[in-house]
């Protein structure tokens, strides 16, 4: 890859640092999409011993690229995102990916197809971590930053997504315990 090509990719990806998510950090500022993606990858790194049969390098690659489409559309909270929003994001992302140099355009297109199909252990794990990271972040944010629907959503979000793994079911239960304690405490 030529240096100018790499710089063009990085300049585009940099926009994820400015795309904010619905959630807040513990310091009361909106979390960026880049921060969410980073911590999803950090989760994958630390869970490699729990999933020895899973290609964790692939899960980390999925985590790194999973929200790049939000460069073009911004972040839309899951409870507001429509199928049309998803299609627009996917279309704009595919247009950008097609401009990338080989073999990266092919690799990314294949990863996105695998992620969307949710048929492999890697895709299932990436998706579970994506959702779990969001709930963990909400638990870390001040309660007064939550929208009304998040009190129930944060108790159930990702429950279906983690069902394939006993470890993730236990992790989700631990996260729910934190959510319940946060709500009771009122902070």
What spans do the regions from the language model cover?
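Active-site helical microenvironments for divalent-metal-assisted chemistry
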Residues: 1-187
């Amino acid at each position: 890859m030529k240096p100018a090509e790499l710089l063009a990719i990085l300049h585009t990806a940099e926009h994820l640092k400015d795309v904010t998510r619905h959630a807040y950090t513990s310091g009361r500022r909106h979390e960026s999409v880049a921060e969410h993606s980073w911590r999803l990858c950090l989760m994958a790194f630390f869970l490699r011993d729990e999933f020895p049969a899973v290609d964790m390098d692939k899960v980390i690659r999925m985590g790194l690229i999973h929200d790049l489409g939000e460069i073009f559309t911004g972040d839309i909270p899951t409870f507001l995102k429509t199928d049309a929003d998803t299609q627009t994001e996917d279309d704009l992302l595919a247009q950008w990916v097609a401009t990338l140099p080989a073999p990266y355009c092919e690799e990314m297109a294949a990863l996105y197809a695998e992620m969307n199909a949710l048929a492999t252990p890697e895709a299932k794990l990436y998706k579970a971590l994506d959702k779990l990271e969001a709930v963990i972040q909400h638990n870390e944010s001040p309660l007064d930053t939550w929208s009304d629907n998040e009190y129930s959503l944060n108790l159930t979000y990702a429950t279906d997504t983690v069902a394939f793994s006993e470890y993730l079911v236990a992790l989700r239960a631990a996260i729910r315990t934190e959510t319940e304690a946060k709500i009771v405490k009122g902070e």
